[in-house]
């Protein structure tokens, strides 16, 4: 790997800079900026790579302070040429997600804002609310993130009432539909009483609601209702009439109504402080507000660049019908023309992006900005509360600095069976779920009927910090994974077991570790026989309680999952020739042991890796009377 001592920044080596710039072609593509440690620190796109990259190093060129700082660190420039600007736009977005360059605008994964997911990858798609966007299945569609989770749940509830949708993730009975089918609330998906093709048509109607196409859907249904009435099919006409009435109630419940027009438009604005930018995007269709989306980003870039980044990511997976004809922006975008051209190509109609200066459209942007400002104030209040809690905790524990990263550990089991541990992480007082970890306890002394929380905690801590003990050169200064504080759920005994293993690893001096006992919320320190004198209502103690409760919740949920998986596997373990890998394939295909029991040998043989002979053996196991 190159080091800064070996390679000077390009701005300090004009001859090499000019040679490198001359190699870059005047074509569309993506460029990478690397620093002296060979890290990618910035990724950008342009319709003309050469002129865009050259602009970063031009004297007198209007650059933000952050971009000017970035340019002084660049030691190498790389590029990828693309055929079109659209390809460059998509490639840039994917590479930024992959490399997370320091000087790019990075959107934060704020799980406060929920999405609606439609699992188009499944024969019978599910529709549900989630706070985590999974990127593995390209066919699945996410709408959001929405600002009002209560309104979102109400829309989904009404949608399920209007259209007959599956009501349960798993069937209630193995051989018949539940009461929802008899009431007309579900088409009997669990027993496949409706074909996947017909069910997907129903789901597509619900998707139109979340695409902001409610009025278009009402028009389609109105036409279908008239045709049904003309054909004297009054039962169908009445059902469609009820669906239209339900959809109109959804429209009536929207919180803002704008002057009616036929133009679809999105309006985006932000409010920012020194750390965060809160962005709101309002979706207006047929003159009504049909969606309020929210995003959070770091605020180190220019406002226009932040808005551009949000719009690029938002529209990256949007279908053509979801792209509006107009996009109103609070600040001018650095590459508005490129984005507009790309969206125009995808929509098949002209898309314009501009900053309104007066009248109704300017007032709309002001309204979006006010909502973004309210959200920023909410975030600031939450940040102040957490800052106060970390300050109080630092004072209680006499820490030299505020604890930025705190890790909490807990053990869960039932009399030693399926023993697991949790590691949860709070960053600046807030849960950082992307850093959560769970462990299966491997200690042979922890068995059914014989639990040992002390040994289990010692094992987990040893596994967590093993690499630091084995490699003394591994720097802990500036390491984002290194905790400022470790909290163990338990009392003096649990703490002593962790202290002992850290001493063996020569890490005790580098780590601050405490325990929090459930009785009276007592805090214990290493080597102290008595707990600290604290008030359970102190902000710092409340922060530890939130951490402890989250560690307990995460450990218990993983323990339940392990027990459930074991119960599923235990029956399959009894079938000769059916190893763990094939068991996983069977469960992935049929979803449950009950479904495997109901399957025919031919259906079982459809599972990859399950031949006719093994399929017959599986069938015979569940149907011994047929053998």
Swiss-Prot record:
Annotated GO MF terms: DNA binding; excinuclease ABC activity
Residue stretches making up the GIY-YIG domain: 26-105
PROSITE patterns reported for this sequence: GIY_YIG (PS50164), UVR (PS50151), UVRC (PS50165)
Superkingdom of this protein's organism: Bacteria
GO terms for cellular component: cytoplasm; excinuclease repair complex
Annotated UVR domain residues: 215-250
UniProt entry tagged with the keyword DNA repair: yes
GO-annotated biological processes: nucleotide-excision repair; SOS response
InterPro entries: DisA/LigA_HHH (IPR041663), GIY-YIG_endonuc (IPR000305), GIY-YIG_endonuc_sf (IPR035901), GIY-YIG_UvrC_Cho (IPR047296), Hlx-hairpin-Hlx_DNA-bd_motif (IPR003583), RuvA_2-like (IPR010994), UVR_dom (IPR001943), UVR_dom_sf (IPR036876)
Keywords: Cytoplasm, DNA damage, DNA excision, DNA repair, Excision nuclease, SOS response
Subcellular location: Cytoplasm
Family: Belongs to the UvrC family.
Record's function text: The UvrABC repair system catalyzes the recognition and processing of DNA lesions. UvrC both incises the 5' and 3' sides of the lesion. The N-terminal half is responsible for the 3' incision and the C-terminal half is responsible for the 5' incision.
Quaternary structure and interacting proteins, as annotated: Interacts with UvrB in an incision complex.
NCBIfam families the record matches: PRK00558.1-5 (NF001824), uvrC (TIGR00194)
Name of this chain's protein: UvrABC system protein C
Designated gene of the protein: uvrC
